[in-house]
Amino acid sequence: MKPHLPMKQSVIALSVLSAISVTSLTAMAQDSKEQQAVTNKEKLETIQVTGRSLSYANSTISSEMKKQQTPMTSALSIIDNLPGVLVNEGDPFGSDEWSTSISMRGFQLDLASQQIGMTVDGISNGNSNYGGGTKASRYIDTENLRSVEVSQGTADISSRSNEALGGTLDFTTIRPRLDEKLTVSTTLGQYNARKFYTRYDTGEIAKDTFAWVSISTQQNDDYMGGSITNSRDHAEGKIISRVGEVDLTGYLSYDDAEEYTYQRIYGLGQYAQEPNWDGLTNNFSGVPYQDQAFRETWGTERENLFGYLQADFMVNDVEVSSNVYYHKNEGMGK
């Protein structure tokens, strides 16, 4: 009789069961970890990075650059702080296109040269010279400006400007807000400078459709003698909508300006002789050869209209962007 044998078999059986249980728990824990890893992986968002090489220097204005300018300054003044870009205007308000010039790494945009292109939201706005068109800054109020991208050097194939030998300035307008909002601002300054601006963001006016409209009026006297007043009335609007798989964007701008020019200074000698006078007179004398320099006769009335409609959509894996635009420029001298 061996009473201890059953006890030994029980111990062996218990040991085997314990080993099987530990193995099963380990396998279950491993399966749980693998399942959790798969779940976490499925939760990760897909991140796509697209890059392209640029042959020339590209730069974009920062929010700090915009803060340095007042609402009365033109949109051109904001890019003056970018490296390699020099903007000259007749006065701090940019009210005189005749005196405005832009230089970018040796290329010019002025009365005699047209080597730098301009676009609005990437859309061509025609010529930017004084005689046959207008600069993009005439189509955009400073408050409606989102950013300016400067492409220095010969423009790439994506530029829609017809005058981009020396580079392109692409002025981008702000997008409509998702919520309804009314913005009103008043700006006052020296030389009887004043500007009144109002913008209304509609919020969602229809399914996936948002828009904003703005109006403004501004005036300022010339800083030479205060004998004339430059004025500008401006209206602008933008709408975005998604129709099916197509993103639509529409934009319209109207500008009515009465501007008086400043005569150019010819050389340092003339500037040293009278740094605060451009050679134009403030009083009418009745003597023909003298009144050629009468400031009130050095003025122009200009109306500028610009608009576009753009559609963006996908065809299989190809992005397609198509647009139509219209611009009209009228003006006369006094």
Residue spans for each PLM region:
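N-terminal periplasmic "start-of-domain" segments of outer-membrane beta-barrel proteins
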Residues: 41-76, 96-101, 150
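N-terminal periplasmic accessory domains that precede
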Residues: 75-78, 101-106, 119, 136-138, ...
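Outer-membrane beta-barrel and related beta-rich outer-membrane complex signature
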Residues: 225, 249-292, 331-334
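Short acidic/polar hinge/loop motifs at secondary-structure boundaries
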Residues: 123-152, 172
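Cleavable N-terminal targeting peptides that direct proteins into the secretory/outer-membrane pathway or into
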Residues: 1-38
